[in-house]
Structure formats: C-alpha cells, structure tokens
C-alpha cells in the first residue's frame, strides 16, 4: 500500500479560510421540463383502442396455444412473443407450451437446438449443455460445416450466454460463433446482402440478448420483426399497440418524477449534483420493470436512485470531511432532529431522504405490507457508512488493496440499497420478511450483480475520476496489488464480470430459498447496468450518450 500525497476531499484553505470543493462540473440536464409539457399532450387511451388491444391479446393467446406441433414453429413463436416485450401477458401459456416440448431432443438443427436450450434456460430449466456435443467433430471442435448455417450460428451465439461456470463447450461456442459471425458482417458490408439478418448479427455482437435490457430490446426487435418476411401481422400489431399504451403510461410517470424533482428544488439546492431525473427513471424502467402494475416500485426506486446520486456526488464532489462526518451520523441514526448540526444543503438532502421512505411506508401500510421499508432504510444507512469509509480513505490519502477495495466498493455501488427498495412492490407472497432476510444473506446473484455494476462502472469512469482526484478505482487497486499494466487489469476485471454473469445464470436455474421474481429483478439490474456502463462509457453521468434511447422509450410512439 502507498499514501497519496494530497487528500482531495473538500477542505478549508488555511490562507483564505474559504472552503475549496472539488466540484465535478457535470453537464446540465438534457430534458428540463420536457415531460411536464408533453404529459399534457398525451392522449388517454380511448375505449376503442383498449378493446382492440384486448381482442388482439386473445388472438395472440390462441396462437401461442394452438401453434402447429412442429417444434421449430412453436419455439419461434414463443421467442418472438418474448423479444417483442409482451410475454408478461402470457406467462402461464408460455410455461405450458414449453412443458409440452421438454422431452423433444431429436432435432439435429442447430437453430432449433440452440433456441430450445436458450428458451428453457431463460425459463429456469437446467437443460444440459451436452445437447451441443452432436455439433462437434472427432477432434472436439465445432464442425466447420456449421459456418454455412448463419441463422443457426446466431442462435448458438445467443444460447451460449446462458452458460454457468464450468460449461467449457459454451465458452468455446462464443469464440467460434463470434469469429464467424463477424465474417458474415464483413461480407454483408461489402455485398449489401441479407441486410435484416446482418443487422441482427451486428446488434447481437454488440449486446447479446441475455445482457440486453428487455424494454430497449423490445423496441429494437419491433423494427427487426416488422421487416421479417415471416412475421405474424397479428402479433406485430398487438406488440406495437401494447408498446404505445405502456409508453403513454411511462410518459406520465416521467412527468410525475420531473414535478417531484422540481417541487423539492433539487437543481437549485444541490446544483453541484448530477441532474439526471429522466435518465434515472429510464434506468429504473430497465432495471425494475416496465409492466403497468409495478408503477409504485418503479417510482419509489427512481426516487431512491436520485438520493443515491445526490449523496454520492456530495461525498465525491462537494462535502468537507467535517460535513460528511455530521451527515453520516444524521443518516445512520435516521433522526431528523440532528439536521440542525448540518449546513443548509445537507439539511435539504436529509429531509428529502427521510421523507421518501416515510411516504413509501405510509402508502404501503394502507395495504398492510410496509414491512419491507425497514430493510430498505437499513440498506441506505449501510450505504452511507460505506461512502464515509471511502471518504476517510481519500482524506487520509490511503490506497487500499484490491481485496480491501472490493469489500467496500462492491456494496458502495448502491445496488443492494436499490434492489431492496425495488422489492417492496413485489407482492405479499414475495416481499416477506423471511425473503428479505434470505436474499441479503444468501443470494449469489446479489453479489454478482454488485460485481458487474461496480467493475463496469470503474472501467467506464476511472480516467474521468483520476482527473478530479477521486479515490482509486478497481482498475488502479488491481494494478497496484498484482503489479500488472492498466490494460491487463481491465482484462482481468472484465473476466470477473463475465463470471458474475454465469453466477446469475446458475442461481436462476436453481432457485431454492430466494423467490424467482427477486432473482429475476437482480438480472434486470445487471442488464440495466450493462446498458449504462458498456463499452467503457458512463451513459448516466454523460447522458447525451443515452438521449436516443430515452427518446425511443418515452417520446416516439410506433406507427400502427
């Protein structure tokens, strides 16, 4: 370990007696009051549209349950329903139909075998990866003849990302398919042939389906599916209508969040913090849910993220060590009476924080299910203590080892705080005291999701943070502990991220004491984190990089 020569927390200059604060200079909001104005223009879904939606829904349900007995057709139909984002309407039907083909193992079609494997694993069924042995040659390598089956190769590529640790054949499949699919793209770019399939390949190479946030993937796939010569017009129309109906509801929620943010006065009272209210809402739309019946959890989680962001920026970019000490005491004791000791900007933060949890508790108490709120408060208190630990490191100029860093930083990413806040809306039989206790103590997926979020965040932001004198990141701590280059450190951290995805996959195949909906929520958070931090970018902090996605999900309805 070594000491940094100059502590870079906010400090009081001895010569001027003025507080010097390492403000990060985040760019201003991109959306302002846009959704306050646009919400007034959102038309209420009329009765005729609702009736059309209901009729199409019944027709799609009939199609799912009466699809011809051909395995390929049935699997293709289920896959389309899921990728178009409307599977939440047909969960029982999909479960039943997959059950009917659970023992159908005779196919030698790479596309069918791979698709069946992926759909069953997505459903939580631990189908063996041995089904791919038939596609290897006598030397144990994938048969070269497979490269001519482009659709099959893409299907195998997507299936391989549902691997768990130790499934070497799936690791080999990713290498094999990636190499040859890139060749397909290269040829397509020169010949302009098979443009729709080439576009799917290009998209999948950028973000495999397993890592893709469902709502964004649905919006992308709606365009792809509409250009597929074999698309079903009824399913496509239903999916478009469903997307637009949900989008109208999401626009209103974005308006609610904007009004809450402005009414409390965040932009004026904490101007140093990131003003990302719409990006926060989108993050929760991807990480918590997009379904209409989970609006409370989506909005509550969005408010919690706003507080996490504001508090994180207070610790990183504004507060003095003395102020942070007082702030930590006030929050960990959860006592509004202690705010008199705080500077004005911190009084505002603490009051806003306590009010969010109090209001949620009062709302849930009306339904007799407020027991999740104490766990949510506890996670927030623990997060503040972790932030303060990192502040002490910086104040003392202390550089932790990688192992020491992980013991704090995996938790300080805030995922645990956020996940528990989102669980309060999962329902009486899921959001129970026992289940809260169990997931906090035993869930491998929780640590895996934290690992993905923290390491990808650090890889995306460590150079920016270095410029403003932030604590060392996972990249620097790994580099220092193991004596490797920056590039090698990043490579090793990405391997740890890949293994964490496998841990999530494994726990979803073996749900025991933790309910499946809680584990699925962690998968969604991992996906949303992948979207925010993929390719070494921080789309949340530098939100111009996600402006297009915000527009697709909130401002641009589909033509029907």
Swiss-Prot record:
Annotated localization: Cytoplasm
SUPFAM superfamilies in the cross-refs: Terpenoid cyclases/Protein prenyltransferases, Terpenoid synthases
Span of the annotated motif DDXXD motif: 312-316
Sites where the protein binds Mg(2+) 2: 312, 316
Gene3D superfamilies: Farnesyl Diphosphate Synthase, Terpene synthase, N-terminal domain
Record keywords, A-Z: Cytoplasm, Lyase, Magnesium, Manganese, Metal-binding
EC number(s) recorded for this UniProt protein: 4.2.3.47
Cellular component terms per the entry's GO annotation: cytoplasm
Keyword Magnesium attributed: yes
Residues given in the record as Mg(2+) 3 binding sites: 457, 465
Major site of localization recorded for this protein: cytoplasm
Catalytic activity as recorded in UniProt: (2E,6E)-farnesyl diphosphate = (E)-beta-farnesene + diphosphate
InterPro entries found in the cross-reference section: Isoprenoid_synthase_dom_sf, Terpene_cyclase-like_1_C, Terpene_cyclase_plant_C1, Terpene_synth_N, Terpene_synth_N_sf, Terpene_synthase-like, Terpene_synthase_metal-bd, Terpenoid_cyclase/PrenylTrfase
Pathway linked to the protein: Secondary metabolite biosynthesis; terpenoid biosynthesis
A Pfam family this chain is assigned to: Terpene_synth
GO molecular function: magnesium ion binding; terpene synthase activity
One GO term (biological process): diterpenoid biosynthetic process
Domain of life of the native organism: Eukaryota
Cofactor: Mg(2+); Co(2+); Mn(2+)
Role of this protein: Sesquiterpene cyclase catalyzing the production of beta-farnesene from farnesyl diphosphate.
Domain notes: The Asp-Asp-Xaa-Xaa-Asp/Glu (DDXXD/E) motif is important for the catalytic activity, presumably through binding to Mg(2+).
Name of protein: (E)-beta-farnesene synthase
Biological classification of the source: Eukaryota, Viridiplantae, Streptophyta, Embryophyta, Tracheophyta
């Amino acid at each position: 370990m070594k000491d940094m020569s100059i502590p870079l927390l906010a400090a009081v200059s001895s010569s001027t007696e003025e507080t010097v604060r390492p403000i990060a200079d985040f760019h201003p909001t991109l959306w302002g009051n846009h959704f306050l104005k646009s919400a007034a223009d959102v038309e209420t879904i009329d009765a005729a549209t609702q009736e059309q939606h209901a009729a199409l829904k019944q027709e799609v349900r009939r199609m799912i349950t009466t699809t011809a007995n051909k395995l390929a057709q049935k699997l293709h139909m289920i896959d389309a329903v899921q990728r178009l984002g409307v599977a939440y309407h047909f969960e029982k039907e999909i479960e039943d139909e997959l059950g009917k083909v659970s023992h159908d193992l005779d196919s030698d079609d790479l596309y069918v075998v791979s698709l069946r494997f992926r759909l069953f694993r997505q459903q939580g069924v631990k189908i063996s990866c041995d089904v791919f042995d038939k596609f290897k040659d006598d030397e144990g390598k994938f048969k070269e003849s497979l490269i001519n089956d482009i659709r099959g190769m893409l299907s195998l590529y997507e299936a391989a990302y549902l691997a768990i640790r130790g499934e070497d054949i799936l690791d080999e499949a990713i290498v094999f398919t990636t190499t040859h699919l890139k060749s397909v793209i290269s040829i397509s770019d020169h010949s302009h042939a098979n443009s729709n399939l080439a576009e799917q390949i290009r998209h999948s190479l950028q973000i495999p389906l397993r890592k893709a946030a469902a709502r964004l993937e649905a919006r992308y796939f709606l365009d792809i599916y509409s250009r597929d010569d074999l698309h079903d017009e009824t399913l496509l129309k239903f999916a478009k209508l469903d997307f637009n109906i949900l989008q109208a509801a999401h626009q209103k929620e974005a308006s609610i969040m904007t009004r809450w943010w402005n009414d409390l006065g965040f932009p004026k009272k904490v101007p140093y913090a990131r003003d990302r209210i719409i990006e926060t809402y989108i993050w929760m739309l991807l990480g918590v849910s997009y379904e209409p019946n989970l609006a409370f959890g989506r909005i509550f989680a969005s408010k919690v993220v706003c507080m996490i962001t504001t508090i994180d920026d207070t610790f990183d970019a504004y507060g003095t060590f003395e102020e942070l000490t007082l702030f930590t005491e006030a929050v960990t004791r959860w006592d509004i009476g202690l705010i008199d000791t705080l500077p004005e900007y911190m009084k505002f933060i603490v009051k806003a924080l306590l009010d969010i949890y109090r209001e949620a508790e009062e709302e849930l108490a009306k339904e007799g299910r407020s027991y999740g709120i104490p766990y949510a408060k506890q996670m927030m208190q623990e997060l503040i203590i972790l932030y303060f630990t990192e502040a002490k490191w910086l104040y003392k100029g202390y550089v932790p080892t990688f192992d020491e860093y992980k013991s704090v930083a995996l938790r300080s990413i805030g995922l645990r705080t956020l996940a528990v806040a989102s669980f309060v809306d999962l329902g009486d039989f899921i959001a129970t005291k026992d289940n809260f206790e169990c997931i906090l103590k035993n869930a491998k997926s929780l640590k895996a999701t934290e690992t993905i979020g923290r390491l990808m965040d650090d890889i995306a932001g460590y150079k920016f943070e270095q410029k403003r004198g932030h604590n060392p990141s996972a990249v620097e701590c790994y580099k220092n502990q193991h004596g490797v280059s920056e590039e090698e450190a990043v490579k090793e951290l990405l391997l740890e991220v890949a293994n964490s995805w496998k841990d999530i996959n494994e726990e979803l195949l073996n749900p025991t004491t933790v309910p499946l909906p809680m584990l699925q929520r962690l998968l969604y958070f991992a996906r949303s984190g992948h979207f925010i931090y993929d390719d070494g970018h921080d789309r949340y902090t530098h939100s111009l990089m996600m402006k297009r996605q915000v527009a697709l999900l909130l401002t641009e309805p589909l033509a029907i």
